[in-house]
Amino acid sequence: DFVITSANLEQLNSTVNGVSYFKVNKEEAKTLDILEDLDFNIDKTLITLNGWLRIVPPDKCKKYNIYNGHPGLITKYPELKGKDPQQRAWDNIDNYNEVGSVVHRVVEEVDAGEIICEEKISTKYIGSLDATYDALRTTSFTAWYRFLKERLYN
C-alpha cells in the first residue's frame, strides 16, 4: 500500500505501518507517471483521489484502479458533477431534500464512473454555506471509510 501526495506530511518518503508515502511535485502528480517508476505491483494497487481537482489521462483511468471522492450527491443530482459542488448544492438547497458525497471509479469523463458508495444527510439540518461544507465533509469521510473498509478488509 502507498500514498502519493503533494502535501507536506511527516511520513513522506518513508514507510509507516506497511504504507509507503511518496512526495511528488505537481508535474508528476498531474500525469500520474510517477506510478510507473515506483517498484511495486501497480495492478493490485488501490489509488484514491482526495481533493485532486485534475483530469486523469484516459490511459491512466483504464490502466489503474483509481477511485475519487466527490462532495456532491451526483446519484440524485447529476448537475453537481464537476467543480465546486458544495457551492452549487448550497445555491440549490431549497430544491434539494438531501445532500451527500460519493466515491466512484475514475473514468475518462469527469465524475461519470460507477458509484461505489454514497452517504447522504437531510437538508433540514443545513442553514448556511458553512453547514453545507460541514455536511459534505462529514458524508465524504463516512463514504471513504465505508469504501476503504470494504476494499481493504473483505
Labelled PLM ranges:
Residues 1-154:
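One-carbon transfer enzymes
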